[in-house]
């Protein structure tokens, strides 16, 4: 019983601290967008990863960084249509 309460408290703490963890009402699209944005921001924020990607793509680091930042706006395309009226 104590382990379950401790786990629930830890999950609530993570959800309060990090947006990408989600909750029971997080849709699949929101979760995917959060994961993609977290990944892109990690690549932009770590210069060695950015240099690796720039080398692999054969483009300057500044251009790759700009492209990744632009991709963060809508990383998974437009949101699916809502069924709410």
Curated annotation (Swiss-Prot):
GO terms for cellular component: cytosol; nucleus; precatalytic spliceosome; U2 snRNP. It comes from Schizosaccharomyces pombe (strain 972 / ATCC 24843). This is Uncharacterized protein C211.05. Disulfide bonds: none annotated. Pfam families: SF3b10. PANTHER family: SPLICING FACTOR 3B SUBUNIT 5 (PTHR20978:SF0). GO terms for biological process: mRNA cis splicing, via spliceosome; mRNA splicing, via spliceosome. Belongs to the SF3B5 family.
């Amino acid at each position: 019983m104590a382990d379950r309460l401790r786990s629930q408290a830890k999950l609530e703490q993570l959800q309060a601290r990090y947006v990408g963890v989600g909750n029971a009402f997080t849709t699949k699209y929101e979760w995917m967008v959060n994961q993609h944005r977290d990944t892109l921001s990690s690549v932009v924020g770590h210069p060695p990863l950015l240099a690796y990607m720039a080398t692999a793509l054969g483009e300057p680091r500044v251009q790759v960084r700009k492209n990744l930042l632009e991709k963060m706006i809508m990383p998974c395309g437009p949101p699916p249509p809502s069924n709410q009226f």
